[in-house]
Amino acid sequence: LVLLTHIHSDHFNPRTARALSKERPALRWGCCEWMVGPLLEAGVDKRRVDVISPYNSDDAALYKGLAVVRPEFIPHNVPNCAWHIFDGKEHLFYATDTGTLEGIEAKSYDLYMIEANHTRADLEARMEAKRAAGEFSYEWAAAQNHLSKEQAEEWLYQQMGPNSQYIFLHQHQGKGG
């Protein structure tokens, strides 16, 4: 099972999708409507694509023997979703590439995999250094489209139960890091 979130090249590679589809023809692809076209263009068999709506919380896909999955729309600069995954015993929440998780509920899940792209102080320092050097700064857009570590921690504190765990994803790597 491959769950897709959005079209950006660091999350979806058509050549990889094509290769996976050929090497594993029984593989299922779970996605929202905005990823169907790119999957089909990559050569994935439409009979293997499960389209799940992120706008209806009752819409979920059951993958027998594996998990129940449900997407939830999250804001980004292209259509994007987070995934709620339940394997019969444990709940997982997965979200990257969003400026906010405000309004998203995932109370007391077992594992949270969410981005913590930057710290606010680091982002501001990079913006100021680029301004001073007269360079283009993409950092403002990054702040709108990616969770800061502070935002991620605040959301986690509101959601986590006593046994919950988390993994930070999509962390900014500077030059040489």
What are these regions (language model features)?
Residues L1-C31, E41:
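Active-site metal-binding motif and surrounding structural segment of the metallo-beta-lactamase
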Residues I7-F12, L39-K64:
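Conserved N-terminal glycine/acidic-rich loop preference
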Residues P14-S21, V36, G103-A106, E153-Y157:
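Short amphipathic alpha-helical segments and helix-helix/interface helices
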Residues R28, E105-G177:
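Cap/insert and terminal regions of metallo-dependent hydrolase folds
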Residues W34-E41, G174-G177:
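Short, charged/polar "capping" segments at the starts of alpha-helices
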Residues I52-L111, A121:
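Core dinuclear metal-dependent hydrolase active-site scaffold
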